[in-house]
């Protein structure tokens, strides 16, 4: 199965700061998908097919990458972006998730 490694595990950002988190796959995948999860809620699909934003996701989010290296970027951090973000692949069975990047907001 394909192992997804997310980095960093935990990070913090101030309002307006650019944020980048990465997801590294142990083998090449065609696309990467990202989910956002806030405490006490179910994960929400956030970015799919590497770079497409799910409905309602703000344009400050961007996804990019190919093969084994993918990233999620927030061009200008907002307080409501604080959450845990998970990458996911289904190019190869079984479907696998990364262990998450927890993004905290600095005041």
From Swiss-Prot:
Start and end residues of each stretch annotated as Framework-1: 1-23
- According to its UniProt entry, what is the function of this protein? Anti-2-phenyl oxazolone (PHOX) Antibody.
**Region (Complementarity-determining-3) location:** 88-96
Q: Which SMART domains match?
A: IG, IGv
Query: Keywords, A to Z?
Result: Adaptive immunity, Disulfide bond, Hybridoma, Immunity, Immunoglobulin
Annotated disulfide bonds: 23-87
> What organism is recorded for this protein?
Mus musculus
Write down what this protein is called: Ig kappa chain V-VI region NQ5-78.2.6
Region ranges (Framework-2): 34-48
GO CC term (a single one): immunoglobulin complex
Task: Map out region (Complementarity-determining-2) in residue numbers.
Answer: 49-55
Ranges for the region named Complementarity-determining-1 are 24-33
Region ranges (Framework-4):
97-106
Pfam families for the chain: V-set
Provide the GO biological process annotations: adaptive immune response; immune response
Give the top-rank taxon of the lineage listed in the UniProt record for this protein.
Eukaryota
Lineage of the source organism?
Eukaryota, Metazoa, Chordata, Craniata, Vertebrata
Q: Which InterPro entries match?
A: Ig-like_dom, Ig-like_dom_sf, Ig-like_fold, Ig_sub, Ig_V-set, IgV_Light_Chain
What are the boundaries of the region Framework-3? 56-87
């Amino acid at each position: 199965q394909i192992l997804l490694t997310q980095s960093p595990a935990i990070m913090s950002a101030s309002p307006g700061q650019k944020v980048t988190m990465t997801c590294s796959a142990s083998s090449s995948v065609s696309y990467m998908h990202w989910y956002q999860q806030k405490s006490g809620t179910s994960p929400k699909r956030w970015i799919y097919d590497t770079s497409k934003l799910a409905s309602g996701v703000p344009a400050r989010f961007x996804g990019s990458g190919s093969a084994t290296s993918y990233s999620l970027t927030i061009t200008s951090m907002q307080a409501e972006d604080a959450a845990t973000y998970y990458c996911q692949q289904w190019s190869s069975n079984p479907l696998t998730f990364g262990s998450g990047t927890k993004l905290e907001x600095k005041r």
